[in-house]
């Protein structure tokens, strides 16, 4: 398994967000699904130590994530947040910023292509992009780190139907071209069926089901 959570509990503002969660996420395309407030985004942040549990263990490729340097882990297991958080400046400058953190010289044109953006977007200013374009620029910036895992926190929740379809198509196409596992957070079970092979379902901070999407989310 790529990730394993064993009896994980975490609190925020003295409120239990996840309670006694035991779950597994394999390599490939996984998702964490559930209603708003079920703890999905918190679980995602445990995977690269943007949050640490109150109790229990989170393992990445069999090793406790607390044994890893947090910054190194976050370059390898990269979060694309729900709301775009681009730096001021051009898309290329955003990509180069991430690549510099990883000590790499980025192929900007290729990264834009992987993210479903044309080369002309390199010189576009982040503040002039639509929300859907910002989301794909965030993806290009994340890919500049050459991560092994992408954590996708509700990447289409703020998009209209057309933009949502474009981002989904980009992610599906990306998996065919790059060896990267994805963990998608979504409240939309139809999206989970389209985008993932494995699902962990949460409700009120507890796991209520997990396994292959075809079994757990059968129509």
Q: How would you name each of these model-derived features?
A:
Residues 161-163:
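Helix N-cap at the start of a conserved alpha-helix in ABC-type nucleotide-binding domains
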Residues 105-121:
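Conserved ABC ATPase "signature" region
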């Amino acid at each position: 398994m790529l990730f394993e959570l064993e009896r994980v509990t975490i609190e925020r503002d003295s409120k239990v967000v996840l309670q006694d969660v035991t779950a597994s996420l394999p390599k490939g395309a996984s998702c964490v699904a559930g209603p708003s407030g079920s703890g999905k985004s918190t679980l995602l942040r445990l995977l690269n130590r943007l949050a640490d549990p109150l109790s229990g263990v989170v393992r990445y490729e069999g090793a406790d994530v607390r044994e890893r340097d947090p910054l190194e882990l976050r370059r390898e297991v990269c979060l694309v947040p729900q709301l775009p958080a681009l730096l001021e400046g051009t898309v290329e400058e955003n990509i180069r910023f991430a690549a510099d953190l990883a000590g790499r010289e980025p192929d900007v044109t290729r990264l834009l292509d992987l993210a479903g953006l044309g080369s002309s977007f390199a010189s576009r200013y982040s503040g002039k992009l639509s929300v859907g374009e910002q989301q794909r620029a965030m993806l290009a910036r994340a890919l500049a780190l050459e991560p092994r895992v992408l954590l996708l926190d509700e990447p289409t929740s703020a998009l209209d139907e057309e933009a949502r379809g474009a981002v989904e198509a980009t992610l599906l196409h990306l998996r065919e071209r790059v060896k990267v596992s994805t963990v998608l957070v979504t409240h939309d079970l139809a999206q989970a069926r389209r985008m993932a092979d494995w699902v962990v379902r949460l409700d009120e901070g507890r796991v209520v089901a997990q396994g292959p999407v075809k079994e757990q989310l059968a129509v």
